[in-house]
Amino acid sequence: MEALKADVTQGLSKGSLITCADNTGARELKVISVAGYSGTKNRHPKAGIGDKVTVSVTKGTPEMRRQVLEAVVVRQRKPIRRPNGTRVKFEDNAAVIIDDLDEPRGTEIKGPVAREVAERFGSIASTATMIV
């Protein structure tokens, strides 16, 4: 994993409900923890675009519900600042479920994916239909 080029303001915290942007059968995910987060005592972990998070499936098919999985945040409502000065924000907060090798578990990704995610996770970029 490489560093992000954009200044990502983290718009999701622990407990946030986000939509699942792939076709694994999950529809809504709840953020449980953020991988690699080291913060102040008693502070909720924050996540932004391109971060790996541990999620619990709250809505979806009966086989997927209540599972604890790894996911990557691909969209967030909070604007992020790119090096050229532009700011990018999306309509919703969304994530893609991944496996142990950082490959997406689904075969298609619905909606746009941020360019920062595509640079960090090549397998998600190849599966995505639109990169913004």
UniProtKB/Swiss-Prot annotation:
One of its GO terms (biological process) is translation. Keywords: Ribonucleoprotein, Ribosomal protein, RNA-binding, rRNA-binding. SMART domains: Ribosomal_L14. It comes from the Archaea. CDD domains: Ribosomal_uL14. Signal peptide: none annotated. Pfam families: Ribosomal_L14. GO terms for cellular component: cytosolic large ribosomal subunit. The keyword rRNA-binding applies. GO terms for molecular function: large ribosomal subunit rRNA binding; structural constituent of ribosome. Part of the 50S ribosomal subunit. Forms a cluster with proteins L3 and L24e, part of which may contact the 16S rRNA in 2 intersubunit bridges. Binds to 23S rRNA. Forms part of two intersubunit bridges in the 70S ribosome. Belongs to the universal ribosomal protein uL14 family. This is Large ribosomal subunit protein uL14. It comes from Halorubrum lacusprofundi (strain ATCC 49239 / DSM 5036 / JCM 8891 / ACAM 34). The gene is rpl14.
